[in-house]
């Protein structure tokens, strides 16, 4: 994934190879930073306001200084022209800064990873792993912080087992979420996805698919569903801003069928993004 542009608080556009975080920034020392990653379509960020809302909420949960939305928007505006009216990935970061302050904002524009479309074509595989975020709220469930070591360790564990992705389940076997995705599956004309009450991330793409599903002919059920319900589904998929709708074709070695919902929702998502750009 190639970095296209970088902008930092107090510096504006900088060479992406330059250092922009102080060595004593608590984002580096303690992981005290919040971030958002979103898709850029035709040079325009998709649902930027929703991502800024979540960035603000995450920063508050972590105890960071309040996000200065205008400053973050200005930083985003500096890097977006480098997309050349094409598609890209935009990451927004709000750090605690050094102990005496001030906080720092970053905007990083990158190419969309090349592996995503081939993966969508073949379908992704996953393994289930134990997750405990809902049971221990001090682990900041639903917060997008840069303390992503657990998620990355889970992804590495999944890959060591020959899978692309990990799906977290709790101690009672209830499906939670993927390492960087929300999880969905279909029974007939009903789509199921774990409830936000379980402490999962309130995905912006998840919310968008809930809006789009009725027009595609599906009802959505949010709740606490057992892993066996997912394994018995007619089809399954994940959602995220950068990966969009990604079909799941195997979980824990059990094959899942390809179905129409993931394709319909992916098409509807792209059409909405095009209309918004």
Give the label of every model feature segment.
Residues 1-67, 73-78, 95, 99-277:
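Helix-start/capping segments and mature chain N-termini
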Residues 79-84:
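Phosphate/pyrophosphate-binding loops at sites that engage ATP/ADP/AMP, CoA/4′-phosphopantetheine
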Residues 85-94:
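Ordered, amphipathic secondary-structure segments that act as subunit-interaction surfaces
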């Amino acid at each position: 994934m190639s970095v296209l542009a970088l902008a930092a608080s107090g510096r504006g556009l900088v060479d992406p190879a330059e250092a922009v975080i102080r060595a004593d920034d608590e984002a580096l020392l303690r992981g005290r930073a919040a971030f958002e990653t979103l898709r850029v379509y035709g040079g325009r960020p998709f649902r930027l306001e929703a991502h800024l809302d979540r960035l603000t909420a995450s920063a508050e949960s972590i105890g960071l200084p309040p996000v200065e939305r205008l400053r973050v928007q200005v930083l985003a505006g500096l890097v977006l022209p480098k997309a050349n009216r094409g598609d890209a990935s935009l990451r927004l970061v709000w750090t605690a800064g050094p102990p005496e302050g001030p906080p720092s904002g970053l905007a990083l524009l990158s190419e969309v990873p090349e592996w995503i479309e081939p993966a969508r074509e073949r379908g992704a595989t996953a393994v289930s792993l134990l997750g405990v975020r809902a049971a221990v709220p001090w682990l900041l469930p639903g917060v997008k912080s840069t303390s992503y070591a657990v998620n990355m360790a889970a992804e590495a564990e999944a890959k060591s087992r020959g899978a692309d992705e990990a799906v977290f389940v709790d101690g009672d076997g209830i499906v939670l979420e993927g390492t960087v995705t929300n999880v969905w599956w279909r029974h007939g004309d009903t789509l199921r996805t774990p409830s936000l009450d379980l402490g999962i991330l309130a995905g912006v793409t998840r919310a968008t698919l809930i809006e789009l599903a009725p027009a595609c002919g599906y009802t959505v059920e949010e709740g606490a569903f057992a892993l066996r319900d997912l394994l018995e589904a007619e089809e399954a998929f994940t959602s995220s801003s950068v990966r969009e709708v990604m079909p799941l074709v195997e979980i824990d070695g059990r094959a899942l069928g390809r179905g129409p919902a993931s394709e319909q929702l992916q098409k509807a998502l792209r059409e909405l993004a095009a209309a918004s750009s």
